[in-house]
Amino acid sequence: EAVLAEQPDVVVVATGATPFVPPVPGLGTCPYAISAWDVLLETRSVGQRVLFIDDQGGQESTSAAEFLLDQGKQVEIVTPHYSVGEDIGPTSKPPVYARLFGKGVKMQSTWELRAVNNGTVILRNVHAGVEVERNDVDTLVFSYGGKSHDQLFRALEGRVPAIENVGDSYAPRSLHHAIMEAHRVARKF
């Protein structure tokens, strides 16, 4: 209603996204499972022994892991991909890895989170199907990307003369996409 009261000619919505929590059994109700966003925004406390699930494959995971390593946490990053930070560019990955390994990170590739059950984290190798149970985790951090926060766009659609939805509120992707969309919209109007 506040937006409508302004009687805008054009509304550009860029309300972002929220962390995506996949339907992994037990993850959504696990009291010690938090998102990488929670780590970076410091909205939740983090234990000493951290298991980090990097499903997204971007810098969100490596940045949050490095942030925790700088606090003296023991961090292990597990990913279903062939490498942690799979989508990090070839010129950026070597210095990221150098910093992480220099701070004591452990990494395991081709493992995915299968379930969280009564304090036990269950991982599965994506090739062999072998499952392992982990009971040595104080905090489980996950990074599965985002879910569009587009409620404002949907509420205003059809109620203003022109409306554009950009960035993660349109679809969670990289910062480059958000900048490109915002540039396109700015040139359009």
Label each residue range with its predicted role:
Residues E1-V21, G28-P31, S35-Q48, D70-A155, ...:
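A Rossmann-like FAD-binding core segment of flavoenzymes
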Residues D54-F67, Q71, Y82-S92, Q151, ...:
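A conserved FAD-binding loop/helix module that cradles the flavin
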